[in-house]
């Protein structure tokens, strides 16, 4: 991307952020553009803030124009405005009335692209994840695109996969995520995957990233900050009785579905069942509380990519921050599901 093109894009983005809309379907907000978050000390001891960095990543600035991937593939074009407008009324009702969503911390987002990392809950429908994506559209509209990520099984489903791509969802490969950053977009990851969304109900307020640390190096290579996201309530939409790890091994689900679990759930309207598909339950109307935390700026020195101790330390720090925030959010719950 040339300098003049980048400046023109930035001017266009700033202009679009000043416009106002209220609903998810309208795709704009009447709020001011979020400010850079409070400076956070990174692993190398330096303090940095979001500042007024351009949406294009530092890593992208050193690349030749164009991505290695066609931006029309795998949801890289971002959410389809027509689809978002068409389904906006439904999602507004779900967020505001059914799940009574509370989401805070917009002002902590840096102005530059970032990698959001959090937990998602409630089996394959993960309503806490969906509400973040839809609330993001309501907040920013087309001025700042967020790409969700989804398991290969969902992305390759004939109908569901196309719907996901129209929402801007991408498969969580390194190339896809880097291509999104190169466009100046944001990405959200849930590293825990099936270990996270199928954790038992008694662990519903536990941050599970599954020991999967690849996202740390992704952010380091791209030169983007990591923004942790904490949430509670989503795991009250479905009761996971057992993760079924032994059953998953017996059924060879690791090879068949890239899953280490075969969960047994209690849900409405099907009762107790082996839960392997997205359409086996209707989420209960649990109140969802979500908080966007301060950005964490990683050391982008290439030599750090091979520093396992540094990667481990940053992973533990991020997981701990999410857990502390989840504990605080859980204290507000008066009663499971309904409060």
State each model region's role:
Residues 1-39:
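N-terminal acidic, proline/glycine-rich, low-complexity intrinsically disordered segments
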Residues 193, 203-303:
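A cross-family acyltransferase "interaction/gating" segment
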Residues 163, 179, 217-221:
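Hydrophobic/aromatic ligand-binding patch that stacks against planar heteroaromatic rings
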Residues 115-117, 188-190, 291:
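Structural motif
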Residues 156, 279-339:
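C-terminal terminal-subdomain/extension
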Residues 25, 35-176, 244, 320, ...:
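Membrane-anchoring hydrophobic helices of lipid-metabolizing enzymes
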